[in-house]
């Protein structure tokens, strides 16, 4: 299937790769269907793009690529909502805020996006743990 993004142009995807966010994503509660696109020339970053709004695409990454000690505990509600059966089925990504100055690029470690890769259900959660920041610099000083 094909989708035209305002920013990224034509995107080809397979319908089986559509990720459903029943609760939407923070700031985009009404948008439920997204695809995750590899950005090979910009590894380890990916594009999480809405299929319902051609202007909504979020740059995301695995927090573990930058913060090896990042940890979170999923609540029973999240495990049930996403129908998670095995830890290996869980993908964790965080949104990126870009900046022309590399030291000002940040990620939201307090609001990770959890995806069950076995059934393509996703949900953004808010961690109560105050040690993680909403705008955590990706690159140290």
From Swiss-Prot:
It comes from the Bacteria. Gene3D superfamilies: BH3618-like (2.30.290.10). InterPro entries: Flagellar_assembly_factor_FliW, Flagellar_assmbl_FliW_dom_sf. GO terms for cellular component: cytoplasm. The keyword Chaperone applies. The keyword Magnesium does not apply. Its main location: cytoplasm. One of its GO terms (biological process) is regulation of translation. It holds the Pfam family FliW. Keywords: Bacterial flagellum biogenesis, Chaperone, Cytoplasm, Translation regulation. It is found in: Cytoplasm. Belongs to the FliW family. Interacts with translational regulator CsrA and flagellin(s). Acts as an anti-CsrA protein, binds CsrA and prevents it from repressing translation of its target genes, one of which is flagellin. Binds to flagellin and participates in the assembly of the flagellum. This is Flagellar assembly factor FliW. It comes from Clostridium beijerinckii (strain ATCC 51743 / NCIMB 8052) (Clostridium acetobutylicum).
